């Protein structure tokens, strides 16, 4: 299907940054509306020809602070909502209440009625390369849910609740670099 290319959708975005009087901190607010095509696996089926572009609105409030000349701390709250997402109809026999952006399986009779919401808090400490060291430590606590075709709120497939990442490295000379990466996250929701 190429008819998605014939539509114009307005996607406004807004970004404001306020530098605090201490000279090393800032508050940042971002908001925006985004569109994306439904997955091609659904668009390829004629019965799904009425699907719309998935609509997303997201916004965040962020506090940023320079701890040193090469180290920055960021703390953010964010929220993202989806609408018009692909969803199975409750009228179809033997359908499970699945948020179809999470699982790509071949279905016909898909509707643009899905909705989802994600809220989270993220902490990030970044150390830019200085004196041959660099790294970052990041942690996120979030909740990602969707409403199924019976309007029951359910966990999305990737709703792990928390994720932590540590990445770091040391470059003793231009030809050598040692790095490490470690990730920890909650289990898949059931």
Tell what function each PLM region has.
Residues 1-22, 37-38, 42, 151:
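Signature of Gram-negative outer-membrane beta-barrel scaffolds
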Residues 1, 41-48, 56-58, 102-110, ...:
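Extracytoplasmic loops and strand-loop junctions of Gram-negative outer membrane beta-barrel proteins
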Residues 1, 16, 29-33, 75-79, ...:
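Transmembrane beta-barrel strands of outer-membrane/channel proteins
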């Amino acid at each position: 299907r190429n008819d998605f290319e014939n539509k114009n959708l307005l996607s406004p975005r807004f970004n404001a940054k306020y530098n605090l009087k201490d000279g090393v901190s800032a508050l940042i607010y971002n908001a925006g509306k985004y569109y994306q095509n439904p997955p091609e696996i659904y668009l390829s089926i004629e019965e799904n020809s009425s699907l719309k572009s998935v609509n997303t609105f997201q916004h965040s409030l962020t506090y940023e602070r320079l701890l040193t000349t090469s180290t920055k701390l960021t703390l953010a709250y964010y929220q993202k909502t989806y609408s018009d997402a692909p969803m199975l109809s409750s009228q179809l026999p033997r359908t499970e209440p699945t948020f179809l952006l999470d699982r790509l399986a071949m279905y016909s009779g898909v509707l643009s009625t899905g909705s989802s919401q994600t809220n989270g808090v993220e902490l990030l400490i970044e150390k830019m390369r200085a004196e041959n060291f660099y790294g970052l430590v990041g942690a996120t606590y979030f909740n990602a849910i969707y409403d199924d075709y019976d309007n029951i709120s359910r966990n999305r497939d990737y709703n792990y609740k928390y994720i932590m990442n540590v990445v770091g490295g040391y470059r003793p000379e231009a030809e050598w670099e040692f790095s490490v990466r470690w990730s920890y996250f909650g289990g898949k929701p059931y």
